[in-house]
Amino acid sequence: MGAFLDKPKMEKHNAQGQGNGLRYGLSSMQGWRVEMEDAHTAVIGLPSGLESWSFFAVYDGHAGSQVAKYCCEHLLDHITNNQDFKGSAGAPSVENVKNGIRTGFLEIDEHMRVMSEKKHGADRSGSTAVGVLISPQHTYFINCGDSRGLLCRNRKVHFFTQDHKPSNPLEKERIQNAGGSVMIQRVNGSLAVSRALGDFDYKCVHGKGPTEQLVSPEPEVHDIERSEEDDQFIILACDGIWDVMGNEELCDFVRSRLEVTDDLEKVCNEVVDTCLYKGSRDNMSVILICFPNAPKVSPEAVKKEAELDKYLECRVEEIIKKQGEGVPDLVHVMRTLASENIPSLPPGGELASKRNVIEAVYNRLNPYKNDDTDSTSTDDMW
């Protein structure tokens, strides 16, 4: 859903921080979409005796940004302040936390519905949500919709959330039981996710509870015991990222970037840029959370990266010189490079992850190019 721009908006919003033995960075980009509907939350050290806990989440809005923005500001409070989460005196148990997360989602969804109807009529926007609540002993993965989170442990994808799509058999059964249908893999032929916050037009079937509606606000929650030796990093991202990169691809790419820089904002920016150049047409947001045992910068990897960049610079110069009269356009350069067996390209990112390096050399050698010929579109690029 949503209209597209003539050129992508590539300006990024960044943030980073550290605490509780964690480091995080994030990046978000509007991309080709007419509006930016993503939002995010990053909190290290929670109030009310949970100073050693942290919370991170990505919200992918649709049909507007209102629900995503409200959730990024208030969902955490709804989770930690309800009685199911607090339980009895002392630190909440695993079951307290899981029940509290579920209750928090249902409460904020109902609160937004009532608030929307009172203020200005029903808000038709909605949002997916993917997040992690990290305690000293556990990582709680939270998912509602088709954004995704994964845990990289011991250099492999150890866990990833499951997308809530209407075509999923259990989701489809609930939709049909509520009187709906799944057409072209969408709820009633329209909405591409089967669980979300907001989307109140899909939550008005009389006689059905909130988790039995066409679209459910109920999250899936998984608790994973932390492993100090093996846990490396967590990635949370909206579907604008996952549309063009698989779980293993993104895990490998991030790991390779962490071996050449400890700047987590830079790593996230590279993820977003690479996904844009791989053809993503959606808003893009990614949060990278690193545990103490995350990959460290390797002098050997840094050297190989510099050698690769130098090689690409030389090849771009050669391609342009070989053309003779008339400078080839950037698409021609990219296609030529894509046809070659270039060693040491970043795993998962491949040539797309080096587009900025290639373009910088191209622009330096061709400073008087016509901007109209230098499209950022990736359609049929290579």
Curated annotation (Swiss-Prot):
Broadest EC class assigned to this enzyme: hydrolase
Keywords annotated in UniProt: Cytoplasm, Hydrolase, Lipoprotein, Magnesium, Manganese, Membrane, Metal-binding, Myristate, Nucleus, Phosphoprotein, Protein phosphatase
Residue positions, PTM Phosphoserine: S375, S377
GO MF term list: calmodulin-dependent protein phosphatase activity; magnesium ion binding; manganese ion binding; protein serine/threonine phosphatase activity; R-SMAD binding
EC number: 3.1.3.16
PROSITE patterns the UniProt entry points to: PPM_1 (PS01032), PPM_2 (PS51746)
PANTHER family: PROTEIN PHOSPHATASE
PTM description: N-myristoylation is essential for the recognition of its substrates for dephosphorylation.
Gene Ontology biological process terms in this record: cellular response to transforming growth factor beta stimulus; dephosphorylation; N-terminal protein myristoylation; negative regulation of BMP signaling pathway; negative regulation of canonical NF-kappaB signal transduction; negative regulation of non-canonical NF-kappaB signal transduction; negative regulation of transcription by RNA polymerase II; negative regulation of transforming growth factor beta receptor signaling pathway
Binding site residues for Mn(2+) 2: D60, D239, D282
Matches recorded under InterPro entries: PP2C, PP2C_BS, PP2C_C, PP2C_C_sf, PPM-type-like_dom_sf, PPM-type_phosphatase-like_dom
Source lineage: Eukaryota, Metazoa, Chordata, Craniata, Vertebrata
Compartments, as annotated in UniProt: Nucleus; Cytoplasm, Cytosol; Membrane
Gene: PPM1A
Organism: Homo sapiens (Human)
Membrane topology: Lipid-anchor
Protein name, UniProt field: Protein phosphatase 1A
Note on how the cofactor is bound: Binds 2 magnesium or manganese ions per subunit.
Lipid group attachment sites (N-myristoyl glycine): G2
Hydrolase recorded as keyword: yes
